[in-house]
Amino acid sequence: MFLLTAEDKSVRTSKKIFETYHFAYDNPCIREVLEGVRPDVTVFMGAYDTGFLWGKGSSTASAYTSGLFQLLMNETAGNVGRFLYLSSEEVFGGEYTQDISCEENCAAYTVRAQAIAAGEELCRSYFNMGYETIVLRLDHLYGEPLTGAEARDICARMSVEGLETGEIRVNPHNRVALLHYSDAVEFLYAVITAKKMTYGVYQISSGETISVRSAAEFVAAELEGVKVVEDTGRERMEPVLSNQRFAEEFGIRIVHKPETEIGR
């Protein structure tokens, strides 16, 4: 396993990583790295890449899309293998009354979400040209963040809100399908080892919705003095991604449940 990161050399690495390369994704050295490593599968962290500082807005979005474009050009020019692009439910910012299919058009409203959606389109264009560039949308990924930059999921946001205000305010009618890191890794492994991919876009979801209030209560139970407050005007409905396409091709088995994992 090799790691390519735009973060500086202080970034933590795992013992399972053979070698780490610290380059921006549009660095001319990338082609040389890819030619030397020749990966069978490349996983672009996309929506979960902590190397991008989204507080800088449009400049970060430009760096994100240009870096992805350069990486894809070098990958496909060298024909080095499958390319997986990790996206999220964040590209759907509208209101939805039913599960969202893989073919639904993105409705991204924030700069970050628009950049992630633009990355999806770029990967799909390469897929349509015959390359194995696969978009994987992960639905409400959650788990224990190791850094502040990773604390972006709905449970982490609830924890921060509770610690800062003593309350977690939720819409009692809102529901969400939570996908634990560990389950997501198993599903990603199935994609990495698959002999052939049928489609250019897949959605990975637990397929099991719970009320946002229940999730908030699981979080509040681990935070002393924090209460859950209902507020019907507070937030939009969370999108729920249909996992039908992925389930038909790879199967879905959820091991880690929110009621036992949140707050661990």
Model-derived segments and their meaning:
Residues 14, 52-59, 94-98, 147-148:
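Conserved catalytic-core motifs of eukaryotic protein kinase domains, centered on the activation segment
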Residues 68-69, 113-124, 156-159, 186:
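Conserved active-site helix of classical SDR/Rossmann-fold NAD(P)-dependent CH-OH oxidoreductases
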Residues 42-44, 69-111:
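Conserved Rossmann-fold NAD(P)-dependent oxidoreductase catalytic core, especially the SDR/UDP-sugar
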Residues 23-63:
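NAD(P)H-binding glycine-rich loop region in Rossmannoid oxidoreductase-like domains
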Residues 124-176, 181:
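NAD(P)-dependent short-chain dehydrogenase/reductase
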Residues 5-11:
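Short, polar loop motifs at secondary-structure junctions
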Residues 61-62, 104, 108-120, 149-156, ...:
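Short-chain dehydrogenase/reductase
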Residues 171-264:
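C-terminal substrate-binding subdomain of Rossmann-fold SDR/epimerase-dehydratase oxidoreductases
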